[in-house]
Amino acid sequence: YGKKKKVSDMGKFKELIEEHPMCAGCAMTLFIRLVFLALPKPEHTVMVGTAGCGRLAISQGNVPFVYGNYGDTNAVASGLKRGLELRFPEQEKDVVVMCGDGGLVDIGFQGLMHSWFRHEKFTTIMLDNEIYGNTGGQESGMTEKGLVAKMSPRGKVDDKMDMLGLAKVAN
């Protein structure tokens, strides 16, 4: 830990995640490996995740993982970060939320926005695949307008949510 790594080192980078039960060629495992590779202090980091197949790979990593209910990842991270600050006042502990767009923006919107309003000191990473991929292909708030999916055969009617704009307003 603590050694500088580049993306070109990923083929040799196996300390944090190696084996996983994901489908062969799944982009989620690459995404998770990149996040783990970028952690400044993985030995002092706790990951928070929720429903979705990404939790299968995250939980196989050498980083503590908390599995929250669907949509409550930022609420869990808020309490976890505060608890870690009380328990380890001399050691900074990082909390990182890693979640898909459905769990974070649609179902977890309230917790996400309130963590921004309170200026909570943890990182939230959203994997925006623009659809509920695990449950059959329903549109999400992050789906582009007009996209035709299995569960929205006429195409999405509404615009994609402007999460960057909401984040700017919240801060």
Each model region followed by its residue ranges:
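Conserved thiamine diphosphate
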Residues: 9, 140-171
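Fold-independent oxyanion-binding glycine-rich loops
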Residues: 19, 26-28, 50-52, 99-102, ...
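Hydrophobic/aromatic ligand-binding patch that stacks against planar heteroaromatic rings
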Residues: 37, 114, 166
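Glycine-rich, charge-decorated loop segments at or immediately adjacent to ligand/cofactor-binding or catalytic sites
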Residues: 133-138
